[in-house]
From Swiss-Prot:
Organism classification: Bacteria, Pseudomonadati, Pseudomonadota, Betaproteobacteria, Burkholderiales
Tagged with keyword Transcription: yes
Family listed: Belongs to the MraZ family.
Domain SpoVT-AbrB as annotated: residue spans: 5-51, 77-120
Record has Heme as a keyword: no
Matches recorded under InterPro entries: MraZ (IPR003444), MraZ_C (IPR035644), MraZ_dom (IPR020603), MraZ_N (IPR035642), MraZ_sf (IPR038619), SpoVT-AbrB_dom (IPR007159), SpoVT-AbrB_sf (IPR037914)
PROSITE patterns membership: SPOVT_ABRB (PS51740)
Name of the molecule in the record: Transcriptional regulator MraZ
Top-level taxon in the UniProt lineage: Bacteria
An annotated GO BP: negative regulation of DNA-templated transcription initiation
Quaternary structure (record): Forms oligomers.
Length: 142
């Protein structure tokens, strides 16, 4: 399970360095193979390959009404390998789609990661924190 936030800077080739605390898990559970695709909230999702296969099957089984979402998730997916130093290449197309040029935030979201442009994430988080919590949290104890 992945959790926590990491501030990262992509290098000039568009590579991100996976935080050390996640590298061993990714090497052991996914043989350093990852899949990156678009997220509807404007970030990217990064899946260990085994988790991507589960997600891909769920998306592929959706009815025809979801065809455009299938295209967004599956049609934009890119398989990548983490190199020996823990770097992953994020394609120019995916970086552009998420507005990521250099500074980014990697969020562990359980079975996958979200990769955000740092400024976009900070603005979105601040906006959410100003509003009311969703009703699903009404009976949730903190």
């Amino acid at each position: 399970m992945f959790q926590g936030a990491s501030s990262l800077a992509l290098d000039t080739k568009g590579r991100l360095s996976v935080p050390t605390r996640h590298r061993d898990v990714l090497s052991a559970t996914a043989s350093s193979q990852l899949t990156i695709t678009k997220h509807p909230h404007g970030c990217l999702m990064i899946f260990p390959r085994n988790e991507w296969e589960k997600f891909r099957e769920r998306i592929a089984s959706l009815p025809m009404q979801a065809q455009w979402w299938k295209r967004i998730f599956l049609g934009n997916a890119m398989d990548v390998d983490m190199d020996a130093t823990g770097r992953v290449l994020v394609s120019p197309e995916l970086r552009q789609a998420a507005g990521i040029s250099k500074d980014a935030v990697l969020l562990g979201m359980g079975s996958y990661f979200e990769l955000w442009d740092a400024a976009t994430y900070a603005a979105q988080e601040a906006e959410q924190m100003k509003g009311e919590m969703p009703d699903v949290f009404r009976d949730f104890s903190f």
